[in-house]
Amino acid sequence: NLARDVANVVIRDDDLATLSDAVAQGRAVYRNIRRALEFLITTNMSEIAVGIVEAAHGPGELETPMELLWINLVSDVLPGLGLALADPDADVLDRPPRPAGEPIIPPDHGRRMALDSGTIAAATLASHFVGLARYGPGPETRTMTFLSLSLGQLLYTLFCQRSDIRDLRPGR
């Protein structure tokens, strides 16, 4: 009984595969939390950047409260939940353990997130300014901006989900 009180891990059955499954699940949970956080921070930074540029360009250019609510509910919360609840990668036990003091979002990931956020914002703003040039301020331009931002964020979900795609990026 003393051994159970001082142990870091107690296996309640005689199957060591239980320990392997627990390690795999723990690594998957950590990776999923990281993916969801990276997704949410990156996409929200892109929303903020678009909002700042739109506000600086003119008061009639901002998205409506309903559009912002839709973006936050549909293209932030639902994909974030999907990333957080994803199944473990097949090679989760083949990877070395992460360093004990590593932050949940390492500095190189922060730089990549800023670049990704800027890319989403730039594509959205390009659509916004094309809409302004073609239609002028109004619902058509807002719709183009809204759809570009939503689509960019939803596509970014796929990018966050696939770690093998992430590793193809420059600097990785």
For each feature predicted by the language model, list its residue ranges:
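Membrane-embedded transport module
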Residues: 2-168
